[in-house]
């Protein structure tokens, strides 16, 4: 080969080296940007995991509160039904023989009043009205918890 051939090869190699060096710099810059983006994504994933744990804890708490409220509503409903039945019996007793006190004492001995509800028809009706109001309030709270629970489970749908 001649000297001129070596010069041409050398020029081609230098151009190739410059191109490779330029591409290497671009790739290093791209790698640096990708590493920065990966760090941002890592932080976002960490934050989302924290939110997920918080939402799961809130969900468990909401389910427990909802369960407690439903149990309370069930208990109040049972008591209210018992009181309604007792009010009907009292009404029959009043209209039948007028011996309310004797009938109430008999029921007390039989264990009909487990929670010591008030004595007397009017007091029982007032007690029943209070229980009914409490039941209505608890049902409203239960519905609100259900709505909140659904919002936690399916954000944007409830």
UniProtKB/Swiss-Prot annotation:
<keyword id="KW-0175">Coiled coil</keyword>
<feature type="coiled-coil region">
    <location>
        <begin position="26"/>
        <end position="96"/>
    </location>
</feature>
<comment type="function">
    <text>Tumor-associated antigen.</text>
</comment>
<dbReference type="InterPro" id="IPR051500">
    <property type="entry name" value="cTAGE_MIA/OTOR"/>
</dbReference>
<comment type="similarity">
    <text>Belongs to the cTAGE family.</text>
</comment>
<protein>
    <recommendedName>
        <fullName>Putative cTAGE family member 3</fullName>
    </recommendedName>
</protein>
């Amino acid at each position: 080969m001649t000297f001129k051939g070596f010069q041409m090869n050398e020029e081609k190699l230098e151009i190739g080296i410059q191109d490779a060096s330029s591409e290497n710099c671009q790739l290093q810059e791209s790698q640096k940007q990708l590493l920065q983006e990966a760090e941002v994504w890592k932080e976002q994933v960490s934050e989302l995991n924290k939110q997920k744990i918080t939402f799961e804890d809130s969900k468990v708490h909401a389910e427990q509160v909802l369960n407690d409220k439903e149990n309370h509503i069930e208990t109040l409903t049972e008591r209210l039904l018992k009181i309604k039945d007792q009010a009907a019996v009292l009404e029959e007793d009043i209209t039948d023989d007028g011996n309310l006190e004797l009938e109430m004492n008999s029921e007390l001995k039989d264990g009909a009043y487990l929670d010591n509800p008030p004595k007397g028809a009017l007091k029982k009706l007032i007690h029943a009205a209070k229980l009914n109001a409490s039941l209505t309030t608890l049902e409203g709270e239960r519905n609100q918890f259900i709505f909140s629970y659904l919002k936690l489970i399916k954000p944007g749908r409830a």
